[in-house]
Amino acid sequence: MTDATYDKVTMFGADWCRDCRRSKALLDRLGVDHDYVDVEADPSAADRAEAISGRKNIPVVVLPDGRHLVEPSDAELQAALTASGVV
C-alpha cells in the first residue's frame, strides 16, 4: 500500500516500455477511467513511482484504495481492478 492518495487508477509508465503499453491497453479495453503519467515527460514522476513501489521498474499502477502493482500481468491487473471494485 502507498501513502499517496489517488482518486482514480493512476499508471506511471513510458511509451518505450512494452509492459506499460500492454497495461495501458488493458485499462483502455476495460474502460477504466485512469490517469497516465509519463515518467519520461515528467522526470519527477519517476521519483514518485519509485517512492510508491520501492523499485525503479515500470509500469507502476496505483489503485484508488492505495494498493499498487509493479509490472503486473494482464491477469494480475484485471484481478486487482475487480477486487478493488474498479471494474
Give the ranges of each region predicted by the language model.
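Extracytoplasmic thiol/disulfide redox context detector
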Residues: M1-T10, Q78, A83-V86
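Non-catalytic, surface beta->alpha helical segment in thiol-disulfide oxidoreductase systems
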Residues: L63-V87
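Local sequence-structure signature of Cys/Sec-based thiol-disulfide redox active-site neighborhoods
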Residues: T2-L30
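Short active-site oxyanion
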Residues: K8-T10, D33-D35, D65-R67
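Thiol-based oxidoreductase modules, predominantly thioredoxin-like and allied folds used
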Residues: V32-A46
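Structural micro-motif
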Residues: I52-V61
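Short polar/charged helix/loop
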Residues: S44-I52, Q78
